[in-house]
Amino acid sequence: MSAPSPSLLAAARDMAGQQHYPQGALYMVATPIGNLADIGLRALHVLDLVDCIACEDTRHTAALLQSYGLHKPLLALHEHNEAEAAQTVVQRLREGQRVAYVSDAGTPGVSDPGARLCAAVHAAGLRALPLPGASSITALLSVAGTGGHDGGFVFTGFLSPKTTERQREVQAIAADPRACVLLEAPHRIEALARDLAALGERPLTIGRELTKQFEEVAQVAARDFPAWLQAGAHRTRGEFVLLVHPATAAIDDNMDEATLRTLDLLLAELPVKTAVKLCAEISGAPRNALYQAALARRKGAQED
């Protein structure tokens, strides 16, 4: 991508400049996850406005800025020096500087460095402000066909690189009726696929290299994920975001009336999760089945 024309940067300043950007504040700026055209106008404005940009990788960020015709002093802040570098940022903020933080791609602080930086800024009584933008998490959710509206979703990020611990984490996903979003790197994707195959028929939406030239979005049963990877040599390359769809545990038609009555009484007064938890403790019924029953009863009540 060639650098944006001066008129585009001027338009970004005109549109985004209508908002106040206080001095002495940290700006957490989302950057593209692949396609450079996904940069936000406010992101361009703030990256041009700030006194300094802290970043996960100075070489990567320098190249990114050059793509947009921007040049700023850079400060390395990554997982290995975040605590120390955060204090440097805090000092700059105390001096009244505006500082931006960007990770290598996407929204900083979400499975990327930046969270400890924000914690240090808040602890110092200073401001941290978000500039939302690209995120592989919401990108995949938007095309998965299950936005978590029927029970929410959980984001687990990267699972453990250790086999036993990762398999234990997959078991926890299996027991959770909600949708689950996770990330994985290319060198570990085959091992993760083998473990996720234990989820059997549970649907899985795969996002590979999202927004890039060779992006792929596919849906398979979890048990078929290893075979999907092996169907093309290119499929083990690139960054992955995965969505394990909500469990579809069958509701036991023979669940006793007393349990269902208890569930109804709890649902009348409490949120679904709390009602299900208490009903499971009272009745001993499986939480998965109770959760599905609760969702069905709430949906039926809304339609009546």
Which stretches of residues belong to each language-model region?
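Class I SAM-dependent methyltransferase SAM-binding "motif I" and its flanking Rossmann-like core
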Residues: 116-176
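Short active-site oxyanion
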Residues: 46-53, 125-129, 178-180
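Short phosphate-binding loop-to-helix
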Residues: 79-93, 113
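A glycine-rich beta-strand to alpha-helix segment
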Residues: 94-139, 187-191
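Short amphipathic alpha-helix with an adjacent loop that forms part of the alpha/beta core around
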Residues: 18, 87-94, 229-231
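A contiguous loop/helix-start segment that scaffolds small-molecule binding in enzyme catalytic cores
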Residues: 3-8, 15, 23, 98, ...
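Conserved helicase motor
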Residues: 76-83, 159-163
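Glycine-rich, flexible N-terminal cofactor/catalytic loop recognition
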Residues: 2-80
